[in-house]
Amino acid sequence: MTTVIDGKNVAASVIETVKSATSALESETGVRAGLAVVIVGDDPASHTYVSAKSRMAKECGFLSVQHTLPEETSQEELAALVAELNADPSIHGILVQLPLPKHLRSEPIIQSILPEKDVDGLHVVNAGKLATGDLEGGLVSCTPAGAMVFVRRTYGDDLSGLNAVVIGRSNLFGKPMSALLLAANATVTTAHSRTKDLAAVCRNADILVAAVGRPEMVKADWVKPGAMVVDVGINRVPAPERGEGRTKLVGDVAFDECAKVAGVITPVPGGVGPMTIAMLMANTIIAACRMAGRKPPKF
């Protein structure tokens, strides 16, 4: 029987751990974890995401601060706000919602966030710590961190002897995911658009992670029987069966056919997606614990 992972359930258990660690930190040290979210402009999708993040931060018991800046905010004004948040001892996590309006350069802003407050895990210092296997010192990008919770709950902490294939080499997901699997002792192949005979490479995987943004690219005959398949893709495709002009969300994996072969699989939606915000909260309490000199919780 194939196990279909319920991402909402796993995310809820992560949030429970965050809540108890947050109240323990506050009762033992008087420190309340603080998350600042910065949004520039009025992109509706970004505002939806930010509201969800702020709401979840409050639910976790954090000090939740939202800075909404007008579309015409200058690079200097945004940089000044980040500098202010860097210097604020009540803020342990800083998140700048991307994408920024076209006239702003996101990279200098992201790299100006203190690495220890970079709860999105996008600072080069955090990327470097992950690449060198320093998982105790850095903060890991939220989506790969969330996918890794699924892997650990399936196989445990030590992946010795297991082959993992990550399709996708983006800085946001593919590279950090490969690094996390490697740090857990898996034998890792990072595949991408230039990989020769991708299906054959995938068939060797005990853990197959797809993150390329190509709807239902991974077919059943790419999957080793009994393997774990983690689908990170999120693609909107036409759904004429739902009526004219209707669409639906699908992943990078042809779910129905792959679910017949895989041992464990994540659906889209409802798989990796809910984990992203949960791991943002996890990173915030980890950052707060470290700054207070306490041992952070494990996820």
UniProtKB/Swiss-Prot annotation:
Belongs to the tetrahydrofolate dehydrogenase/cyclohydrolase family. This is Bifunctional protein FolD 2. Its EC number is 1.5.1.5, 3.5.4.9. It holds the Pfam family THF_DHG_CYH_C. GO terms for molecular function: methenyltetrahydrofolate cyclohydrolase activity; methylenetetrahydrofolate dehydrogenase (NADP+) activity. Homodimer. Coiled coil: none annotated. GO terms for biological process: L-histidine biosynthetic process; methionine biosynthetic process; purine nucleotide biosynthetic process; tetrahydrofolate interconversion. It catalyses: (6R)-5,10-methylene-5,6,7,8-tetrahydrofolate + NADP(+) = (6R)-5,10-methenyltetrahydrofolate + NADPH; (6R)-5,10-methenyltetrahydrofolate + H2O = (6R)-10-formyltetrahydrofolate + H(+). Keywords: Amino-acid biosynthesis, Histidine biosynthesis, Hydrolase, Methionine biosynthesis, Multifunctional enzyme, NADP, One-carbon metabolism, Oxidoreductase, Purine biosynthesis. Pathway: One-carbon metabolism; tetrahydrofolate interconversion. It comes from Rhizobium meliloti (strain 1021). Catalyzes the oxidation of 5,10-methylenetetrahydrofolate to 5,10-methenyltetrahydrofolate and then the hydrolysis of 5,10-methenyltetrahydrofolate to 10-formyltetrahydrofolate. The keyword Signal does not apply. NADP(+) binds at G168, R169, S170, S193, I234.
